[in-house]
Each structure stands twice: as C-alpha cells, then as structure tokens.
Amino acid sequence: MLKTNPHDHTLFKIYLNELERLAVSAGFEVVDKIVQTRTKPKTNFLIGRGKVKELKELVKTLNVDYVIFYNSLSSRQKLFLSIELKCEVIDRYELTLMIFENSAQDNISKLQIEYAWLRKLTPFFKLEASIKYKGEHPFFRSMGEYAFYKKLNMVKRKEKTIRLSLEKLVWERLRQIDERKKLGIPTIVLAGMYNAGKTALFNAICGCNKPVSDSPFTTLSSKYQLSEIESQKTFFVDTIGFVVDLDPMLIESFKLNILDLRSADIVILLVALDDPLEIIELKFKESIKILKNIGVEEKRIIIAMNKADLLNGEKRAALSLFLTSLLSGFEWCFVSAKEKEYSSLLSLITKKLQELNRPQSPPQTASMFISRRTFQSSSS
C-alpha cells in the first residue's frame, strides 16, 4: 500500500485491514503487509525503487504468487510491477471483481462483471502487447503484430457486445421503474457496506428467504419484493453492497444497481454496529459520499443502525449519544434484522413518504416576483 498522507496514522490501517479481509474472502492467504509513505506515487511502479527491490526479495523468499495493492494501479504500473516482481500483480479493483465472480449466480451479474473486467484490462493488454511487439517489424504486419491486432479487435468487439447488451437492460430497467412510478407504488432501496445485513433485513421485512452469508457481496443483482407498510403497497429492493473508497469505474460498470438507488423514493442506509466506533463513522461517511455521487439526495435517506441485538440497554444509551452527533441531519433508528426488530424503521419510512408526497408551497421570493409581474400588467 502506498500512503500519500504522511499525517495519516490511523486511516491507512483501517484500509489495509479491509484489503486483507477482502483478500481472505477471495481465497488468498496473506503472508505479509507492506506500507510505503510517499506524497506522490511513482509513474512506473507506484512505489519507490527501493521498496520495489524490497518487495521483490520478499516475493522470492516467501514464494508469493500474488501481490495485491490497495491503491488503483495504472496499466503501466501493473505491467512494470509484474515484470519486475515476476508474479501476478493486482489492485483492489481486480480483487473485488474476483470476489464478485465467486458470488455471481445470475447472468446479469456475470455480464456486468465481465464488462468491468474488460474496461480494466483492455488498456493493460494494449500496453503489454505494444511493448512485447515493439521493434518487431521485419515486414508489414509480422505474425506477432498480426496476432496482437487480431486479439485486440476480438476484445473490443466483445466489450462492445456486452456494452450494448447492458444498454438494453438499462432501458428495460428504466421502463420497469417508470411503470412502478405510474402505479404510484413507492420504492424503498436498502443500501450500505457489504455485510451490513441488508439481505437479512430485506428477508425479515418482506418475509423472503434470499441467501445470506458472512462472505462479502452475496447480493450482486438487485432483488425486488412487493410488500405493505400500514396498508401501503411498497417495493423493497436489496442492492449490491458498497466497499470503503469505492472505485468510480466499478460504480459505472454496475449501472443497473445505480438506477435502483437513483430512482428510489427512500434509501435505507444500513450501518452495522459490530464495528469499532471509528470504523462505524468511516463506513457511514463513505456510504453517504457514494450515495451523493450516485445522485441520491439526503432528504431521501434514512439511516438504520443494524445489529442492535448486540447492545444491552447501557451500551445502547451510550452509543446513542455518539450516533446523535454523527448522524446529525438524518433521521435514524436502531434495527435488528436478526431479531426482526424494525418497527421504528417502518414508522420512519411512513413518515418520510408522507413528507415527500406533501405538496410544497412556493418560495416567498417567487410569490413576490409573481405579484410584481401581475401588478405591472394590470397597470399597463
């Protein structure tokens, strides 16, 4: 990991632990962790030459198969590191996609994952091939160069085919969203970091039995269920989990999930209470940032602090003081998907729907403007 903020003595440890957890989930055995502090990443290797040399020795000594970087690697950095270290080099984006692949069950998820892979690796493949066949021009289109262009064109065609397929799915999803709007059925989307308990709460509220696992990203494609809250028909949607410091390109590759969040009447942001306070705060702030980047307004967000069953009365009271400050400006409540304790959440949803459906009175400035225009017209 490259740490670019020399004054960060805590946050990078959280990020590194998160990376280790993801690596273990993907089936890797983590044998060591290395951090370098530099204010600016190096163009070719991300890290400095001395650290590359140290890492190379470690790879050889420990017989390492993969080196996983927390930082996003450019195609150039990935290629040069792979050549220098003589092993597979991946970043957190690729690691996340590996976990997605292990969890993918439906065709839509697999299609989105493949598209994300192609977007990431096509530039790398082009750079790798350009270096490999550099200088190999004994005559026009040597065999190596010909093979390169043939493979590159095949990859481009595949990427285009998948992109067009996803665009069709996007239009179909937009049509479904529009149909729900016409029916007047509000949509409630559950969002949050992976393992926050979204699917467990979805099952509890909707009476479903969708797969739940401690492994990250059990849910990749959105799940829908028509339910009722105080005789009000409501669509509940369970979506893919977030990760801390989520790569924007990864978000862009999962447009179908973004559409569900962006079009929701209410987004229930689940935050798990089984983490230390600093991680609870980090995950909450990161989740809010992701939702804002997607286009979800704060007024449509309700915070559900899940796994409240882990708290006794004294702990809950003490934690409430911390959360009241942290969640200032948001409506929030404690929930427990495990114990099916979510009545407070349903009350907040009902209240929020009433607020959102309430006609808005025009601003005072607009009224004054209209009055002046009317007055001028009558006098003329």
Predicted stretch roles:
Residues 183-186, 205-235, 243-256:
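Switch I (effector-binding) loop of TRAFAC-class P-loop GTPase G-domains
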Residues 15-24, 56-59, 73-83, 87, ...:
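Conserved C-terminal guanine-recognition region of P-loop GTPase G domains, centered on the G4
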Residues 1-98:
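N-terminal accessory targeting/assembly segments
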Residues 95-113:
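Short alpha-helix plus adjacent loop in nuclease-associated cores
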Residues 119-196, 202-203, 292-380:
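C-terminal-of-GTPase-core extension/linker across diverse P-loop GTPases
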Residues 19, 67, 118, 201, ...:
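Residue-level signature of catalytic and energy-coupling elements of molecular machines
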Residues 6-10, 209-211, 240-251, 272-281:
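Flexible beta-alpha connector loops of hexameric P-loop NTPases
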Residues 2-5, 36-39, 98, 239, ...:
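G-domain G4 guanine-recognition motif of GTPases
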